[in-house]
A protein has these predicted regions:
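N-terminal, charge-rich interaction modules
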Residues: 1-21, 25
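Feature captures the catalytic cores and cofactor-binding loops of soluble hydro-lyases/lyases
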Residues: 23-24, 28, 32-49, 53-116
């Protein structure tokens, strides 16, 4: 599944408006959920979707460092403008939803994200 398809199917709001087509059509390789950046750095893998409630600028840095396909901010968590600026500069898709992380992750799993 491609990032854009995931955003469309789950009706997620794209926050990074200046990302490339390559970023939007990157393959989703799996998923990871955590609000601790250190856990994401140690356990998330390139190509994964990261579900978090964090919206500060270090989220974009970690996503870029790992090579994540996108960051999904759940639970109507606030996302700082600095975060979006860094994400756009690093071609990282950031999207948001007011749905709780648990429900979002369940829907992603039902779509096949993370299934081997």
């Amino acid at each position: 599944m491609k990032v854009k398809e995931l955003l469309d199917v789950l009706n997620l709001k794209l926050l990074t408006k200046d990302v490339s087509e390559d970023a939007l059509y990157a393959e989703v390789e799996g998923g990871y959920a955590s609000d601790l950046l250190s856990n994401a750095m140690g356990q998330a893998q390139p190509g994964m979707v990261w579900v978090t409630m964090q919206g500060h600028q270090n989220v974009a840095a970690v996503a870029s460092l790992i090579g994540l396909s996108c960051v999904l901010v759940a639970g109507d968590g606030p996302v700082a403008e600095e975060t979006l600026h860094k994400a756009n500069m690093n071609d990282i898709v950031v999207a948001a939803t007011d749905e709780p992380a648990f429900e979002l992750i369940g829907k992603m799993y039902a779509l096949g994200v993370g299934k081997k």
